[in-house]
Amino acid sequence: MTSASTKVGEIFSAAGAAFTKLGELTMQLHPVSDSSPAGAKWTETEIEMLRAAVKRFGDDLNHISCVIKERTVAQIKTTVKRKVYEDSGIPLPAESPKKGPKKMTSGVLSPPNAPPPSSSSVPEAGVPPIKKQKADVTLSALNDSDANSDLVDVEGLGETPPAKKLNFDQA
């Protein structure tokens, strides 16, 4: 067995022992016959301790489930973002967040830093700059979970529009 499967086996063995003990305690709590010893009667404090332990166990499992779900969703989003960047020919941003998703009250992440402009996008001297159509992919657009929202078309993001030539010879 691998190390991970050994650890999982140990977890299930411990869980089995815990559930066996819970079953024993439950049987003590609700004796089958009236002939049970007088010491088997539980006090309210003991019952509350058992209830609290079982509740903590359930809460801990729910917390672990949420952590795993958030990590899985973050991994899927990261994979999709990387694929979008690769397919569009845009280099990945230099800073890749390793801290996990940023939580904000508005539910929208800040847009990534735009990659530095390449030398081919700088206009030549004497030619007025051309207003470039904005086609940046933002994190909020990628993180939008609404299936019916407008999709970002990443085809042609790397292409530069043809430069308009000015004719100064007309008089």
UniProtKB/Swiss-Prot annotation:
Give the Phosphoserine positions (modified residues).
Answer: 96
Q: Where is this region: Disordered?
A: 86-171
InterPro entries reported for this sequence:
Homeodomain-like_sf, SANT/Myb
Q: Where is the composition biased (Low complexity)?
A: 119-129
Question: In this protein, which residues make up the domain named SANT?
Answer: 38-83
Q: What CDD domains does the record point to?
A: SANT
List the protein's name.
BPTF-associated chromatin complex component 1
Which organism's genome codes for this protein?
A: Mus musculus (Mouse)
